[in-house]
Structures are given as C-alpha cells and as structure tokens.
C-alpha cells in the first residue's frame, strides 16, 4: 500500500492502513464504508463498527448510538477500549488487560449513563 500526503510525500507499507484521519474528522474520509443514519451520522453496531464494512471501526465525536452524543472532549475516548476489545477478540487475542480502563472510568460499554443527565 502506498499512502500519499496532500504535500506529495509518499509512504509505503506492507499492511493496509487502519486510520484515515484529518481535521474534518475521519468519518468524512471513509464515509463510503458506512451506512448513514437519517441525521447524517454513520450507522454503527454496538461496538462502533460499520454495518457494511466488517472490521472498519469509527472512533471520535461522530460516534452516535440512538440519541446519545459522545462529547468531543471526554466521552468518546471512553469507547476506545470497547473497540480495542472487539478487535482483540476477533483476532483471538486476550483482552482482559483492557478492564483496567474500566477502573479509571475509561471503558464505556453501558450507555445507560448517557441520557439526559450525562455524568460527564
């Protein structure tokens, strides 16, 4: 694979790049890999994975589940461990070490705290 920057720099890698990132948000760069919700945000499964491109995950403030918005500064970061566990499990790798994130309040897999009275 060859990745070319907007400045013409070229980087070669033997593995498919995992992250498409930019200041506008990565969801715009990979929008063709996601079904869209009626509100224009990507449709995700419970593990923040695309419903049409298995193995493609979305992290960041564009993540939405039902009417829950994962705030830009803090809450969306709590979903990183959820994605990491899903990837590790799919590869047959141990994921128990990710539980340490839960003890620090950085493992958000229970969305019941995301309602009207957001705890963050």
Predicted regions and their residues:
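FAD-site-proximal beta/loop scaffold in flavoenzymes
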Residues: 12-13, 20-70
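A sequence-level detector of short, solvent-exposed, charge-rich linear segments
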Residues: 33-37, 42, 48-49, 75-78, ...
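A conserved FAD-binding loop/helix module that cradles the flavin
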Residues: 54, 58-101, 106
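Acidic, Ser/Thr-rich low-complexity intrinsically disordered segments
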Residues: 107-120
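A Rossmann-like FAD-binding core segment of flavoenzymes
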Residues: 1-33, 91-106
């Amino acid at each position: 694979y060859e990745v070319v920057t907007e400045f013409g720099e070229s980087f070669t890698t033997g593995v498919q790049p995992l992250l498409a990132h930019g200041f506008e948000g990565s969801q715009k760069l990979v929008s063709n890999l996601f079904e869209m919700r009626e509100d224009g945000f990507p449709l995700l499964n419970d593990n923040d994975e695309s419903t049409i491109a298995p193995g493609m995950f979305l992290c960041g403030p564009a993540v939405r589940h039902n009417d829950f918005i994962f705030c830009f500064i803090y809450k969306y970061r709590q979903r990183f461990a959820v994605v990491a566990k899903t990837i590790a499990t799919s590869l047959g790798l141990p994921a128990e070490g990710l539980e340490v994130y839960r003890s620090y309040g950085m493992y958000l897999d229970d969305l019941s705290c995301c309602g009207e009275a957001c705890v963050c």
